[in-house]
Amino acid sequence: MPLKILVLGAGATGGYFGGRLAQAAHLGKSDIDVSFLVRPKRAETLKARGLNVESPQGSFGIPVRTVLHTELKPEYDLVLLSCKAYDLESSILAIYPGMRPDTCVLPVLNGLAHFERLDREFGALRVLGGCCHIAGNLTPEGLVRQMTELQRITFGLRPQNSTAGQAILDALADAFRQTPVDLRYSDQVLQEIWEKFVLLATLAGMTCLMRGAVGDIVATDEGTTLMQGMLAECETAATHAGHASRPQVHAATAELLSTRDSTFTASMLRDLESGGRTEGAHIVGDMLARARAAGPSTPLLAIAWAHLQAREARLKRERSAT
């Protein structure tokens, strides 16, 4: 029987990675069965125009199967969860009708805090390990646009997972190998997730705090020192958790965060500057809590988190006054 996958959403992340799986099936390269759980308006767009992806690895447009929350049945082997952290609760409610007792969930959210919540809801046996790297957006016309060359998905078994999860991930890996996606099927997936978490928390904390790209920050008198300091605080948390970054990864991260003229920023900065919601609590706030568990000296993470909280407090105050 082909693997039946439910992809939550068809936006920048779910639309890209789910779309690549659907494209492989559409071309006859894979027998994987992909459905997209979407809202009515997005379903109408996809029915009328198909799923359209603009990508440096090859743009495409294909018809896709969509399903509404009210139409879900418990018939899926795997749910690919790619929501923003602040939408986690509503996403859990959305996928529930599609979950069998043995359905696995593969979250590719940023950070780590979501694992505890998903484990409580579905059981740690069924919540697999994963993360992804992609910069993209969904245009007003419904086009999934990949903005850079980077498009990687990483997944693997967590220590708590069942053997059934292994078979599901094997089939998923086989399907992704028929696509242009950079696949990492890892036997140390928590290490990979932690290494991304360290990079992202440093990048988001500093670019939001300084309101600038990496190159803007390191061009200042104290920018490189501050960037290195926040990276060190995040690495302290990772080391305390037993997942210190591997030397080559740490070196690559440090270089990425110290490159002059770099326009690299976190998507959190774009969300912040556009007045949108951010994953501040899930990324910076959670990293601060984990770093403090390792030791009390976390001044830069504390400032970055206070900055994001102050922004939320101001928005709340201004909205309540109107």
Which residues does each predicted region cover?
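NAD(P)+-binding Rossmann beta1-loop-alpha1 motif at the extreme N-terminus of oxidoreductases
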Residues: 1-59
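NAD(P)-dependent Rossmann-like dehydrogenase/reductase catalytic/cofactor-binding core
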Residues: 2, 224, 228-322
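Nucleotide donor/acceptor-binding cores
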Residues: 2-4, 77, 103, 151
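A structural signal for isolated positions on well-ordered beta-strands in alpha/beta enzyme cores
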Residues: 6, 33-35, 106, 128, ...
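Short, well-ordered alpha-helices that flank and scaffold nucleotide-derived cofactor binding pockets
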Residues: 19, 23, 27, 93-97, ...
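Short, charged/polar "capping" segments at the starts of alpha-helices
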Residues: 42-47, 115-116, 239
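Rossmann-like NAD(P)(H) cofactor-binding subdomain of soluble oxidoreductases
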Residues: 58-144
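Internal alpha-helical scaffold of NAD(P)-dependent oxidoreductase catalytic cores
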Residues: 67, 97-98, 120-130, 141-251
